[in-house]
Amino acid sequence: MRKRKGSADHDSSFTATLTDGSSDLKQCHKGTDADTDPGGSGKEMGRRCRRGGLMWRLRRILIWLLGIYIAIPVIIKVCPSIQAKLVFLNFVRVPYFIDLKRPQDQGMNHTHNFYLQPEEGINIGVWHTVPAGMWREAQAKDAEWYEKSFQSSHPVILYLHGNAGTRGGDHRVQLYKVLSSLGYHVVTFDYRGWGDSEGSPSERGMTSDALFLYQWIKQRIGPKPLYIWGHSLGTGVATNLVRRLCDRGTPPDALILESPFTNIREEAKSHPFSMVYRYLPGFDWFFLDAISANDIRFASDENVNHISCPVLILHAEDDTVVPFQLGKKLYDLAAQSKSLNGHKVQFIPFSSSLGYRHKFIYKSPQLPNILSDFLRAPHPHG
């Protein structure tokens, strides 16, 4: 009986131990669950912290961008000379590694580089490209030969380039080649402050340089036709120049405007650079008045009322730098000009599908026919 009682006590003790063990296991599981919950909460808090940090960084970036956005017009208003640099972009030299003294490096083997002095202390770089038919004869010739070549029967085009770059810019060189192949002498130059020309840029200085070159050419070609071709900002210089010549009673034989605008204020307002500020209250006061403060106008819309020679306007519909509508508006003004009454005024649009944009009209296979039709003369090939 004692054994059975002992056995019962042992069983009871074992059961109690097992029960206690189960209780401990339960406590262990509870502990594990408790440990798991805080871990999940920690991860969630970590994710929230990371999201909060990211949002804070984004807020800081937005604040910086807003500060810059506000600061730029204020800086330009306080320092209007900055706006002049943005109009001229003469400090942008593309391609940079080009020796303007060696036009042959650009494939211009019938081009002579030289320098002229429109006023004391200012030397400007000039290129003279002879007609392609004179290419062989032009090889290794000196300045005297090139100057005498003006005595040929070929007409001359004075080319006035736009802002940025130099007279050696690729799209400009390609146009010289096209015009040379059509039998024209092409004379082009870098305004003061551009390329290897001395001095600082200004509208008055650019126009004076163009007038000096025109007179220099005219003295050497006699009665032969002399046409003025302006591109982009160069159209503003061209209309300034032609207005002066017409006021003197000595108009050029024709004026060709490629991708022109009406005036610099309208062009600046339409330029892609102004897109982020165009609808800002006070845009004119901050940006456009800063241009006027530098005495920069390029008022072609006013100049056409004083021009008395044939005018041809070329403009691509997909031009994003000088919008097509500005060229069309200038044409409409020119067509109504009393001073142009009796002179041919023609507007040639180029479809967007052609992809000529701002500076590739030279690629048009129709360009030779357009020029010969406008100038009322066949091209002087050879």
Swiss-Prot record:
Topology versus the membrane: Single-pass membrane protein
A Pfam family matched in the record: Abhydrolase_1
One of the GO BP terms on file: phospholipid catabolic process
Active site: S232, D319, H358
GO molecular function, one term: lysophospholipase activity
Keyword Cytoplasm (UniProt): no
Record Gene3D superfamilies: alpha/beta hydrolase
Intervals, Extracellular compartment: 82-382
Keywords attached to this entry: Endoplasmic reticulum, Glycoprotein, Hydrolase, Lipid metabolism, Membrane, Transmembrane, Transmembrane helix
Principal subcellular localisation of the protein: endoplasmic reticulum
Residues bearing attached sugar chains per UniProt: N109
Ranges where the record places region Disordered: 1-45
Family the UniProt entry places it in: Belongs to the serine esterase family.
Protein name listed in UniProt: Lysophosphatidylserine lipase ABHD12
Native source species: Danio rerio
